[in-house]
């Protein structure tokens, strides 16, 4: 299973969206959504959460994000945060703890291999996830305007 995720925010904080591209054995599924008042980091985390929550059963997932915050958070920083009672090395509360806890549980359910790609560098699936994240914002705003 392959997943590409992206988050977007217009203003930070501001309206935000998330996008996911899932691919398995030649089949592709896309997901997207938006929130009226959020941050870019929350949308990046939400995209990864939505990708993993969409999977019906535990599996091996190669998840690619353009967010170092997400990749490093889950692969490097998480163990220390948990050891310190969800505090950073500076003893401050971990931002977005609610989402990190959800992502941690999903990361334990699946065998996730975390990959990073530079955003807006022409990587096709990352660009698709970015377009979906922006569609999430657009559709949310259009729905609110009617």
Curated annotation (Swiss-Prot):
Q: How is the cofactor bound?
A: Binds 1 Mg(2+) ion per subunit. May bind a second metal ion at a regulatory site, or after substrate binding.
One Gene Ontology term of the biological-process aspect is: DNA replication, removal of RNA primer
Keyword Ribosomal protein among record annotations: no
UniProt: Mg(2+) 2 binding residues: 6, 130
The entry assigns this protein to a family as follows: Belongs to the RNase H family.
Main location as per UniProt: cytoplasm
RNase H type-1 domain boundaries: 1-138
Give binding positions for Mg(2+) 1.
6, 44, 66
For this record, the Gene Ontology CC terms, alphabetical, are:
cytoplasm
Q: How does it assemble?
A: Monomer.
Q: Which InterPro entries match?
A: RNase_H, RNaseH-like_sf, RNaseH_domain, RNaseH_sf, RNaseHI
- Which Pfam families does the record cross-reference, listed alphabetically? RNase_H
UniProt lineage? Bacteria, Pseudomonadati, Pseudomonadota, Gammaproteobacteria, Chromatiales
Keywords (alphabetical) are:
Cytoplasm, Endonuclease, Hydrolase, Magnesium, Metal-binding, Nuclease
Name what cofactor the protein needs: Mg(2+)
Q: What is its EC number?
A: 3.1.26.4
Q: What does this protein do?
A: Endonuclease that specifically degrades the RNA of RNA-DNA hybrids.
What is the name attached to this protein's record? Ribonuclease H
The record's GO molecular-function terms, alphabetically, read: magnesium ion binding; nucleic acid binding; RNA-DNA hybrid ribonuclease activity
């Amino acid at each position: 299973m392959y997943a590409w995720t992206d988050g977007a925010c217009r203003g930070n904080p501001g309206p935000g969206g998330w996008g996911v591209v899932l691919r398995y054995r030649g089949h592709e599924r896309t997901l997207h959504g938006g929130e009226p008042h959020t941050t870019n980091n929350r949308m990046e985390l939400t995209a990864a959460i939505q990708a993993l929550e969409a999977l019906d059963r535990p599996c091996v997932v190669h998840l690619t994000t353009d967010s170092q915050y997400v990749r490093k958070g889950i692969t490097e920083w998480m163990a220390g945060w948990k050891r310190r009672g969800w505090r950073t090395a500076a003893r401050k509360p971990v931002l977005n703890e609610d989402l990190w806890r959800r992502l941690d549980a999903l990361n334990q359910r699946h065998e996730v291999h975390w990959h990073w790609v530079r955003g807006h560098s022409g990587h096709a699936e990352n660009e698709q996830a970015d377009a979906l994240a922006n569609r999430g914002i657009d559709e949310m705003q259009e729905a609110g305007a009617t």
